[in-house]
Amino acid sequence: MEGRKSGNKELYTKRVHEYDQVINQILKHEQNILSLIKKDTFGAAYKRLVLADDMIYLTTLYLAKFRLSVVLLGGKNENILNEARKTLYKPIIYLEEIVTDLIDAPFSEYEEGVAQISKITEKQRFYLIRKLGLAINLVIDAYGENTKWRWSFIDIEARFAVVAKNIMDLKEISQTGLNPHAEDYDTVIYHLRLVKKLFTKAADKYREKYEIVTNNISDFRNAILFLEGLKRVHMVSNEHREVEEVKRKIDIWKDKMEKDLKQKDKSKK
C-alpha cells in the first residue's frame, strides 16, 4: 500500500511538472503579446482574441492538475482550483476590452469594437464562446455545490453572458443573419439561443442573490438590467411575443424593487 502511494506521488510530481512547463510558456507568451499591444495597438483586438483563447486553455490545464491531485493523491487541491477560477476572469476581461461590458446598450455604442474583429467568422466567435462556457462550467462543477464561491460565480457567468452577446455583429445579423438561406444561419440561431439562455439565467441569479443573500438593491438592479438586455436580443430576433413577456416581467420586478426601496426607507426613519 505504501509503495502504491509512493508511486502515485512520483507520477503526480512528474505530471504536474509537465503541466507547469506548459503553463509557464503560456504565461510568458501572454506577457509578450501584452508588450506588443502596448508598443503598437495595430491588430490589438485580434491579439486579445488570441489571449482569450490561451487563457481558456490555461484554465483547463489548472483543472487537469486539480484532477491529478484527486485521482493520484485522493484529495482536492483547492489552491490549484483557485488558480483555475482566477484564470477564468482573464478571457472575459480580454473580450470585454474588445467588445465592452455593456449589458443593455444599442449596438452602435460598441459597434466599433466588434468591427475590429470583422475577419473572425460567426462560427469562430460561437466556438470561442462555447469553449469559454465549458471552462466556466467545469470550474464550477469542480468546486461542487457547497462552495463559498457559489455567489461569486454569478458575476463570472453574468460577465460571460455579456461578452457572448457583444461579440456578435448584431447589425449584420439583423440585416442578413436571420435569413434561413444565410451561410451562418444555424450558427447565428444557436448563438442567439445561448445568449438568451445566459441572460435569463443571469437575471434570475441576481434576483436570487438579492432575495437570499445580500438584500442589496444593486443586485436587484442588475437583475432588471439583464432582463432589459434580454428584451433587446429578442427585438433583434424579431420575437415580438417574447419581447412583451419580458416587458411584463421587467414591470413586475421594478414594482417589487420600488416597494422594497420604500420599505428600506421606512426602516431607516
Task: Label the model's feature ranges.
Residues 120, 142-143, 252-269:
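Alpha-helical linker/edge segments of TPR/alpha-solenoid repeat scaffolds
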